[in-house]
Every structure is written in C-alpha cells, then in structure tokens.
Regions:
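A structural boundary/capping signal
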Residues: 1-179
Length: 179
C-alpha cells in the first residue's frame, strides 16, 4: 500500500466532506468509500494471474480494477488519513476468490455499537457487518467491512469457505478462521 504517496494522500483528502472534517472519524471513511464506490469500474486482471495495482496507479487510471485493486485503494486511503486497515483474501466454495478491505473501528464494544448505529442511520440499513479478532494480548478488536460489492460500509460479507488471510500494511499476515 502506498498510502504515503502524495497522489494517494491528496486523493484521500479530496474525498472527505467538509462536514466530516476534524480528527479521524468514521464519517471520513464513509465519505471516501461512497465516492470511490460510486466511480468504480470493475475490470478483470489479465489472464494467468493476479495483478495488484498500487493505490496511486489506480487513482491515476480513473478508479478501474478488480476487487483486490479496490481493496488496496480503500485500505490505502484509510491509512492516508490516520486509520488502520487490512485486506482480507477469501476463497469461495466454488474455488474462486475475493479480496476486500476492513477498517479497524475499536476494541470497545460500546463504541462499536455507537458507530454501527451511526452507519445504520446514514445508510438507512438494519444491520452493519464487522468482524472480530483476538489479538495476542487477549484484546478483542473490531473491523468494519469495506467491500466494494457491499451497498455501504459495513455491508454484508462475501460468502467464503472459511479460508481467509488478513494482510496488514506493515507486511504482516495471518490466517483467520472466524468472523
């Protein structure tokens, strides 16, 4: 993820609405997701393998690519404004795959519930989807789904076989067997 690249950082700043200004907040994430998702053109990778486009290149190409390119872009935009993100790679029951981004929202369930309520009001939806993860220190963390195929941030998750790997901006990765 090239979230420190000026193209990526500048684009992230352009996407945030004035009413969402201030310290990093969930409204900024929603602003970015909405605008990128609205302009996204899905285009497959070349035959014979995956191509992973850096966020700055995807921006320069006019927001075109496949699911992993969207995930890389959204995760990079989140990082560019001070958030924490990860990209999940999942396998489907039919052997296909999918990639999507998640944003860290909190380790405090009350705060998560409040953020989910705000998202539900913004998008007039009944449920907001997030995953949980148990950190090595025993702390439970909450991650909001930012999949391009969802109707809103926190939309339903991709149906996978349970084989999911989370990739972090610092190069770490781990297998995740739960949601």
């Amino acid at each position: 993820m090239d979230y420190r690249n000026p193209t990526t950082r500048d684009y992230a700043l352009k996407l945030v609405n004035k009413k969402s200004a201030g310290n990093y907040n969930i409204d900024q994430i929603c602003d970015m997701w909405e605008k990128v998702n609205d302009k996204w053109t899905y285009v497959n990778d070349p035959q014979g393998g995956d191509y992973f486009s850096p966020a700055s290149r995807t921006i320069n190409l006019g927001l075109k690519g496949d699911c992993d390119d969207f995930a890389i872009l959204i995760a990079s935009l989140v990082e560019a404004i001070g958030g924490a993100s990860r990209i999940k790679s999942a396998q489907s029951p039919d052997g296909g795959g999918h990639a999507y981004a998640e944003v860290y929202i909190s380790d405090d369930k009350k705060k998560v519930d409040s953020l989910c309520k705000d998202i539900a009001q913004r998008y007039h939806c009944h449920s907001v989807h997030y995953s949980t993860d148990l950190e090595p220190n025993g702390k439970k963390t909450y991650w909001l789904n930012l999949d391009w195929s969802a109707k809103h941030p926190g939309g339903p998750y991709y149906k996978d076989t349970g084989s999911v790997v989370a990739y972090y901006p610092d190069g770490r990765w781990k297998k995740i067997t739960h949601r």
